[in-house]
Amino acid sequence: PIVPIFNRPFLHYQIDLLKQVPEIDEVILSLNYQPRRIEEIFGDGSALNTKIRYVVEPVPLGTAGAVKYAGDKLTESVVVFNGDVLTQIDLAAVIRLHRERKARATIVLTPVQNPTAYGLVETDAGGNVTRFVEKPSADEITTNNINAGIYVLEPDTFDRIPSDVAWSIERSYFPSLIERRETFVAYIYAGYWIDIGTPEKYTQVHRDIMDGRYVTAPFLNMSA
């Protein structure tokens, strides 16, 4: 989260996106690696005109365990962001769909050319999530929509996540919603999205900013 994108730590861009939704009044950073370094950089969030709270996992808890550990005492809908995703999505629209559908969970899906490198997510005609297929083979591909690593969740569903053990949001928590026939809906987003988890993608982000494919404060369109 603190690798630089030009002159700013990557996490700045995610916080900028969250700040576009006025009702998001607190950012909780779930940390495990170098927590003090991250806290030194971002402080209490006042310099960014937001409120930041830090939660440090005692041991690695997995993607679902980390969400429960950070948000177990929350009572309102929670927006969850993977720490390596850069996007220009309209989060307010995602939250609006979540509320309109009275969903227990909403997942953002994004189309990619080759879902075999990720894991596809199947939905029905009503936009309900029906199945996850991790790193499918070519003959298993039924859609090119993948998990974009952005969710809106209801905290009272966290009770199914075990405490103090590593648990996966993709392999365990989400399938439990499907098994219980909870209202679990998808928001399809076809705009700019990238996972910067590889050196190649990290380099690509800089090119995208230079070429104007990704535009956000403090950047203007640098290709103009």
Locate the predicted segments by residue:
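N-terminal glycine-rich phosphate-binding loop and ensuing alpha1 helix
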Residues: 1-38
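A structural signal for short hydrophobic beta-strand segments in well-ordered beta-sheet cores
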Residues: 2, 121-123, 186
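Active-site phosphate/pyrophosphate- and oxyanion-stabilizing loops and adjacent acidic/basic residues
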Residues: 16, 68, 175
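Residues at the starts of beta-strands that form the adenosine-phosphate
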Residues: 25-27, 51, 104, 183
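Short beta-strand segments
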Residues: 28-30, 82, 107-109, 152, ...
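Conserved beta-loop-beta/alpha segment of the NTase-like Rossmann-fold superfamily
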Residues: 38-125
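Catalytic-core segments of class I nucleotidyltransferases/pyrophosphorylases
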Residues: 78-79, 86, 92-99, 113-115, ...
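Structural signal for interior beta-strand "rungs" in well-ordered beta-sheet cores
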Residues: 223-224
